[in-house]
Amino acid sequence: MKVAAKKLATSRMRKDRAAAASPSSDIENSENPSSLASHSSSSGRMTPSKNTRSRKGVSVKDVSNHKITEFFQVRRSNRKTSKQISDEAKHALRDTVLKGTNERLLEVYKDVVKGRGIRTKVNFEKGDFVVEYRGVMMEYSEAKVIEEQYSNDEEIGSYMYFFEHNNKKWCIDATKESPWKGRLINHSVLRPNLKTKVVEIDGSHHLILVARRQIAQGEELLYDYGDRSAETIAKNPWLVNT
């Protein structure tokens, strides 16, 4: 399943700030959603008993008809199967995305140049789910009509994220102010530490941002908006040099 996405950048980009979505089909295929489960294993070495023969050569100790449990205590394994681990990870990701749990791990700050941005208050490992890009999900045709309406008002910034999923074009419109922090993450093509993915949860698709690498506490979160059209670059050169 191929997914492509871009976040629209326009000349009316909001003054206080300054995507190709990675392929993903559903939660089952999400790439290392988070470090949600681990397991440990223990193993023992079994040394077979030696056959003993008397000097007369007539006595042989034969253990072939005995149960191994007579000699070794059976220990219950605490190891989980790979399916159990995968199911637990998927369930944890589902809850985290739907409940917006990670919002509390991020903070809004103001930069003198870019305006508002988002920093992390905790460390993230490569592949961890960080935050969802939340807004109003709509089909491409509807989004283009709304985009045209926005273009008539220079006071409205661009928070529309266009992407393709299952061979169909969609858009998430996060223009309206909200408490969701994903909409305030700034752009960087030179040093992004996040990437976008589309996952399906309970029949609905969600655009999420995951760590491209280890991210340290206090770092600003950044991802590549992905818009490379000539018109957009001409109006917003910072898209290719930040």
From Swiss-Prot:
Low complexity bias: start-end ranges: 30-43
SS bond partners: none
Membrane-crossing segments per the record: none
Domain SET residue range list: 104-226
Disruption-associated phenotype: Mutant animals lack methylation of 'Lys-20' of histone H4 (H4K20me). In a glp-1(e2141) mutant background which lacks a germline, the X-linked genes aco-1, ajm-1 and apl-1 are up-regulated. RNAi-mediated knockdown leads to embryonic lethality in a mutant background of the dosage compensation proteins dpy-21 or dpy-28. Increases 'Lys-16' acetylation of histone H4 on hermaphrodite X chromosomes. In the TOR complex 2 mutant background rict-1, suppresses the growth delay and elevated body fat index.
Source species, domain of life: Eukaryota
Tissue specificity of this protein: In embryos, it is expressed ubiquitously. In late embryos, it is expressed in hypodermal seam cells. In L3 and L4 larvae and thereafter, it is expressed in vulval precursor cells. In adult males, it is also expressed in 6 unidentified posterior cells.
Coiled coil recorded as keyword: no
Coiled coil region boundaries: none
InterPro entries (UniProt xref): KMT5A, KMT5A-like, KMT5A-like_SET, SET_dom, SET_dom_sf
Protein name: Histone-lysine N-methyltransferase set-1
Species of the source: Caenorhabditis elegans
